[in-house]
């Protein structure tokens, strides 16, 4: 078991806080990439649908097949964003856990006294 002391806990809290700050950028970038891929898929689908011959129900399937690469790119961008978001939430939970450990250690140090007689 690891011995916790206030200095190590503060270092851990600072490290997690820095990771959270970096995850904001990662989440933002991933979401922007998802929105771009989603828009590209919508536009490609609309063009494919309009250019497909035949009845409406057939156009839908033709458009789906014609835009499979755009759909795949959108799905990958969506998964990337969701992963970044879950990572940010996990870091937030880790920060709260370290704060709880810090409170326990401070309480333990406070209960030990200051060496007064």
Give the ranges of each region predicted by the language model.
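Acidic, low-complexity, intrinsically disordered peripheral segments
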Residues: 102-117
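Long amphipathic alpha-helical coiled-coil segments
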Residues: 34, 75-105
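Extended alpha-helical coiled-coil "stalk/arm" regions
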Residues: 27-59
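Short, glycine/alanine-rich amphipathic alpha-helical segment
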Residues: 51-80
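Short, charge-rich amphipathic alpha-helices with coiled-coil/heptad character
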Residues: 1-24
């Amino acid at each position: 078991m690891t011995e916790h002391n206030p200095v190590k806990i503060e270092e851990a809290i600072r490290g997690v806080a820095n990771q959270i700050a970096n995850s904001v950028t990662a989440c933002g970038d991933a979401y922007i990439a998802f929105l771009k891929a989603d828009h590209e898929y919508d536009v490609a689908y609309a063009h494919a649908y309009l250019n497909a011959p035949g009845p409406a129900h057939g156009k839908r399937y033709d458009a789906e097949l014609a835009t499979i690469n755009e759909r795949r790119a959108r799905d990958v961008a969506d998964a990337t964003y969701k992963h970044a978001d879950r990572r940010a939430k996990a870091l937030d939970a880790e920060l709260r856990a370290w704060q709880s450990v810090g409170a326990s250690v401070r309480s333990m140090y406070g209960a030990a006294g200051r060496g007064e007689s």
